[in-house]
Regions:
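Carboxylate-rich, polar loop motifs that coordinate divalent cations or form catalytic acidic clusters
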Residues: 1-208
């Protein structure tokens, strides 16, 4: 039943249900499919689901490519409705990756930089987040491909074209200090596809 869709993301919720995000065919939760319905503002905003993330309060966040960030909210009939975020303030519609840091802050990688927020605050006020990108001098590329939290709680951000960045929030997340690593520091390519740490503290970086 999945094989006719291009699968981009898989996650498991706290009930043991599998969530499957596809390119062009929406989101499958358990046995139910969820897709964009133009007449229903509580439906999925976009059928391209590129990332799924379960936060420490077991909320399920959905990154769409074209419709921004979604929060799945259960309904009384056992189904889900979706709240939409990040589109209004900066028009952040292209979401590739979602990660959480040790402080419970959510980091969202978009085509316009990294968006950081506390989930409780964003739910209360959809404009309560910080955006870091090339425009405000944080990264050399706005296109974020991956985000990884290492065993020391440090956040690594991989970009498309400007390498790898080790990021450290400052001033209560109002600014972001970073160290940049690119081809001049030994990377084969500045397009970062994936990041993973091993049990020895090494960081493995996949590039183009």
């Amino acid at each position: 039943q999945y094989f006719h869709s291009n699968i981009y993301a898989i996650a498991e919720d706290n009930q043991g249900e599998m969530w499957v995000g596809t390119r062009g065919n929406g989101l499958k939760i358990g046995d139910s499919w969820y897709r964009n319905e133009v007449s229903d503002p509580a439906s999925l905003s976009e059928n391209n689901v590129f990332s799924l993330f379960r936060d420490r309060k077991d909320r399920m966040w959905i990154g769409t490519f074209g419709g921004g960030l979604e929060l799945a909210e259960p309904t009384t009939d056992g189904k889900y409705k979706f709240r939409h975020f990040l589109q209004q303030k900066f028009g952040l519609r292209m979401v590739r990756v979602i990660e959480e840091d040790d402080n419970g802050m959510i980091w969202v990688g978009t085509s316009e930089g990294v968006c950081i927020f506390h989930p409780d605050s964003l739910i209360a006020d959809s404009d309560d987040y910080h955006l870091f990108n090339y425009t405000n001098g944080t990264f050399c590329s706005n296109e974020i491909r991956c985000i990884y939290r290492d065993t020391k709680g440090r956040m690594w951000v991989g970009t498309s074209g400007s390498g790898l960045n080790l990021c450290e929030p400052e001033d209560n997340y109002r600014s972001l200090k970073y160290e940049h690593y690119g081809t001049s520091e030994g990377l084969v390519n500045d397009v970062i596809q994936s990041i993973l740490g091993d049990n020895n503290g090494n960081l493995w970086v996949a590039t183009e």
